[in-house]
Amino acid sequence: MCGNGSRCATLLAHKLGMAPAEHLMLTDAGTVHAQVFSEAGEVEVQLTPVRDVALNFSLDLGGTSFTAHFANTGVPHTVIIADDVKALDIKGLGALVRYHAHFAPAGTNANFIQILGREELLLRTYERGVENETYACGTGAAASVAVAHALGLCEAKARVTTSGSEMLEITVRGTDIFLRGKAQLVYQGEFSPAALGL
């Protein structure tokens, strides 16, 4: 499940005339409600319900104990709150979280957040599969706001700035969570499976 990928697929399906501005999308994680806001150049998806939330547990990462939190927003996300996310070694710490025995065998994505205010967070994410920092993780942003809101650190609606400077808006309503942000078509081409021997 990829939150930002869902937003992009929503926009493309609408632009190609395959779906109306508001529609449902089937994913491996479940059904996602999606809506294109053409005038704003934004797309919002309602992710699958937040589940498996766990707050305030300790993780030993390379001999240092961190307070961690967890939420599944279609994929598993661990969230660690930091005073300065820019100062962190995301690749090193992220790998320790991702492969920690606590999350075996599937592993987890690792999100490091900095609370800037009641409606604003900074986010850096280490994604499993990529095995490195990525610059805009939508499901990670959603999990981060879900956790911060559950801890009373932010409002139910908050803006998340990713390390790639992407601004995402997350809204929590109970276990329902919404991801909204800019989306634009940047390339169109043709794919030839035969050229790849498929």
Model-identified regions with their sequence ranges:
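Active-site proximal loop and beta-alpha junction motif in alpha/beta enzyme cores
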Residues: 1-136, 143-198
